[in-house]
Amino acid sequence: MRGIAFVWQFGEVILAIALAPLFSGWIAQCRAWMQNRTAPPITQPYRMLRKLFNKDAALAENASRLFRTVPYVLFATMALAAAIIPSVVTDLPFARAADAIALIGLFATARMFQALAAMDIGTAFGTLGARREMMIGFLAEPAILMVFFNAFLLFGTTALTSMVDNYATHPSVIDPSVVFAAIAFIMVLLAENARIPIDNPATHLELTMIHEAMVLEYSARHLALIEWASSLKLFNYACIGIALFIPWGIAIHGAHVGAVLIALSALLVKLAVCGAVLALIESVSAKLRIFRAPEFMAMAFLITVLGLLVHLLLGANTGA
């Protein structure tokens, strides 16, 4: 049983790495359909990655080893995060060594290294993007921590695998505070992954750039790894949302191969729905001014606080 657990573990990581560009391509395709535009092929991210990997890297003369190493660090960090998230099965050996708080720390580590690399060259755009990225992260982390704290009050644990197992063994555990947490989580997902209304990865206007400003100096394999890591981060956030709010179908400990195949099919359906929802949100939303981002993240934080208050009030009434 121990050996099969490691098979599921590495299988989930490989699955996340392989499906992440496809998930990004699906979102781009859905957004194009909703905006009445010709949709790019769903495999377009793979083609872009292949083209970038086939090019020769061009680096600035004053680029340090940090600048060259950060793309690999970002990709490895996102792959490690994928090993902690129960997207298909909960029997994950690596997940026992880290909980949701450690997962937030991994994302923060990746953000820190990317900001340092953006400032390493000394360009104005890189420094601008790094400062804005750190500001967004500083505002988003309290909200996502409150989301996980909400889950902790429900299940008494911050381990994602234990949360999913609790959902499976206690399917009647439904709390209105989960709705507030889900709304706040979607807002954090949009902010942390450079999506509209916080950021627009398709633009290169200096007044609106955040993520793109940090990667302007990268090319070839380095840019490919950064783009792949960005897709993997979005995929990881989607899987976190699935594990927290719609975990039904995920195979629990001791599941057989048939249950894992069913869980894989359920994951693909959930990802398709999540991608369509994200595309809809981006299609009906307008890009916010950078100075409005703190208000957006403050709203996410307050929504989670309201969810906690609802949970505590309902718990007090139930106890009474």
PLM regions and their residue ranges:
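Interfacial loop-to-transmembrane junctions
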Residues: V277-T304
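Juxtamembrane/interfacial segments at transmembrane-helix boundaries in multi-pass membrane proteins
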Residues: N150-F180
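Juxtamembrane inter-helical linkers in multi-pass membrane proteins
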Residues: N36-F53, N200-H222
